[in-house]
Amino acid sequence: MAALDAIREALPEPARDIKLNLQAVLQPGTLTPAQRWGVAVATAAAARNERLLAAALADARAEVEPAVIEDALAAAAVMAMNNVYYRFRHMVGKASYAEKPARLRMNRLVKPAASKVDFELFALAVSAVNGCETCVRSHEQVVVAGGLSEDQVHEAVRIAAVLHAAAVSLELAGYAAVPSAAAAAG
């Protein structure tokens, strides 16, 4: 976890909790290494921070097969589209939109490179980051029906939350060095 350790060290003091959580959530728990690192890569991609994604990819490549990483990146890409589309349908609340076919290609959901259940878990984590209630509910049902426990789902969402917070915290690092208005005036 050397690359993500470097990210942890780059986080500013206001993100101290995130620094500690980033180390904790990626330790072995209820998820397999493929699930843990797939969620980390997918949510780092969804957070759109190049530094964080590069670090997650570097550490994941040392732990899992390339197919897992490919699926994680595909989940981030497909969910970037689906989360917007299905969140709109949910938010507008009109039956007429719900009846319209999506007509959006999402073949990777059906044919992932590695595990179908793991791909759905990656999609669930990204959907949580992107705030799509419909997608979160749908993917949660699929992974639980596929044999994952609520503890595993919970662990995946904890990873997603911390990776997202790490991306935000990396952005804060540039502002932490900026003097406050009071300090500049004094």
UniProtKB/Swiss-Prot annotation:
Superkingdom field: Bacteria
MF GO annotations: alkyl hydroperoxide reductase activity; disulfide oxidoreductase activity; hydroperoxide reductase activity; peroxiredoxin activity
Keyword Oxidoreductase belongs to the record: yes
InterPro entries assigned: AhpD, AhpD-like, AhpD_core, CMD-like
Keyword Oxidoreductase included in the entry's annotation: yes
Catalytic activity entry: N(6)-[(R)-dihydrolipoyl]-L-lysyl-[lipoyl-carrier protein] + a hydroperoxide = N(6)-[(R)-lipoyl]-L-lysyl-[lipoyl-carrier protein] + an alcohol + H2O
Active-site residues (renumbered): C132, C135
Family matches, as Pfam families: CMD
EC number: 1.11.1.28
Disulfide bonds: C132-C135
Protein's GO biological process: cell redox homeostasis; response to oxidative stress
Keywords linked to the UniProt accession: Antioxidant, Disulfide bond, Oxidoreductase, Peroxidase, Redox-active center
Family, per entry: Belongs to the AhpD family.
PANTHER family, A to Z: ALKYL HYDROPEROXIDE REDUCTASE AHPD
Described function: Antioxidant protein with alkyl hydroperoxidase activity. Required for the reduction of the AhpC active site cysteine residues and for the regeneration of the AhpC enzyme activity.
Protein name listed in UniProt: Alkyl hydroperoxide reductase AhpD
